Amino acid sequence: MTSTQNHPLQTQDDQQRFGQSPESVRETDHYQQEYIEDFTDRWDRLIDWNARAEAEGDFFIRLLKEHGARSVLDVATGTGFHSIRLLEEGFDVVSADGSPNMLARAFRNARNRDQLLRTSQADWRFLNRDIHGEFDAVICLGNSFTHLFKERDRRKALAEYYAVLKHNGILILDHRNYDRLLEGGSAVRQGKGNVYCGKDVEVGPEHVDEGLARFRYSFSDGGVYHLNMFPLRYGYVRRLMSEVGFQQITSFGDYQRDFENPDFYVHVAEKEYRFDVDTTMH
């Protein structure tokens, strides 16, 4: 008799509903099945809040303050790392996510830090249906935008972000350096990188092609999970932002303005139209 406990990969893949051909699962809506409760319960071990805070420093806080932002919509709240940090810094934050399991974990994390999250489960493609009001900034962090597999979905989500911003608002969006992965390179140059900093989990790609980056998350307690994501290229994301209507777009690599082959990109897209600005700025 075979015990399912001896085959955590099979069991957890089944729970995430990847089926017999996981590499063929390339659907935007599937992320809801991927973030099962067991996985979200381990997510903070993947991040390691203290290590990530040290890696980021005050990068996002400084960016928001430089642009005069006070009200922030976090559209990819996850377990609440950025929402809670911003609340602690005095920002007015609304926290949204498409995964109810993630939002539940974020709410508990905030409560444990004497903060109260205002949460909303929302689909980015219909953001204005669920989120009301305008914001100084929208943040979409944690490599979250890669859950959108169709270009139509990506354009619609960006348009929804644009619509909830005030006339001079900004969008801050990050993603992995998928260009390097698609060209045969590694996910991180060395160590754990500066986003997923947990020491008891191994993260790496199992399959990469132009339409899919399938990552494996192996925890020290035997838990193994996967995420299927769309590999966003650097230039493509910038072009898409511009075509949706954002004006000046400034990009960073691993939180630095001057970069070469970083692990992660961060794009800051400004909504405000100014006559004297070169919108081709990199």
Swiss-Prot record:
Catalytic activity: glycine + 2 S-adenosyl-L-methionine = N,N-dimethylglycine + 2 S-adenosyl-L-homocysteine + 2 H(+); glycine + S-adenosyl-L-methionine = sarcosine + S-adenosyl-L-homocysteine + H(+); sarcosine + S-adenosyl-L-methionine = N,N-dimethylglycine + S-adenosyl-L-homocysteine + H(+)
Binding positions (S-adenosyl-L-methionine): 35, 43, 52, 76, 97, 123-124, 141
Any one Gene Ontology BP term: S-adenosylmethionine metabolic process
Top-rank taxon, per record: Bacteria
CDD domains: AdoMet_MTases (cd02440)
Keyword Magnesium: no
InterPro entries: Gly/Sar_N_MeTrfase, Methyltransf_25, SAM-dependent_MTases_sf
Keyword Methyltransferase: yes
Protein name: Glycine/sarcosine N-methyltransferase
